[in-house]
Amino acid sequence: MGASMGPLITIAHRAGNSRALLREALASSVDAVEADLRLDGSRLVARHDRRFPLLPLYYDKWYARWRSEPQVDLNEILDCLDGKASLFVDIKSTSTRALDMLLATLRRRRVVAGTRISGTYWHLLRRLHEEEPGLRLHYTIGDEESLDRFQRLLEGGESASGVSIHEALVDEELAARFQARGIEVVAYHVDQLARAQQLREWGVSGITSGDLALLRALKGHGPPPAR
């Protein structure tokens, strides 16, 4: 078992992208709500898919769809959270304007200390650290290649406060090694309670899942999810 585990952080996967999911996540007493933030005009909005220019048509790797419902923006998410849960951002935009807007909003709403920000564009995380050293930044690691690259950065002297890593990449040795460096490990795409419990025993700090019943069970707030 991890030697110095703090409280477990339960994170509702992409729940900030949908008003209905956001309400459900808060009703489930999760610790944090994940939101995929993109710059859309003058707003930071929460969605995973991209948008075709000038059209309300959105696409991802496997689909395209029209969207009629107004998008959830960052301010609306923070209004809903209102201290009931923290925000876990997956930053999707690469522009400096998006970063500046994000940081300005977090400062204005006085939630810098409680917010975690992850992303696959690691240079953006470095820039955010330069602007606001108190932010909790998590390097997103989704495959073996990015894990190898991250470990080379550590060997080269780079510091990191956290990682958001695909659960399949985590083993006991890796969890212990990162924990020894003071790196907060959040495992995502966790969809089995037994796996979540194993990760926790290894010292993983956070579990990201779209299964709210699983997250409730991890905190002892409900029965195991039905399978």
Describe the role of every protein-language-model region.
Residues 1-227:
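Phosphate-group recognition and catalysis centered on beta-loop-alpha active-site segments
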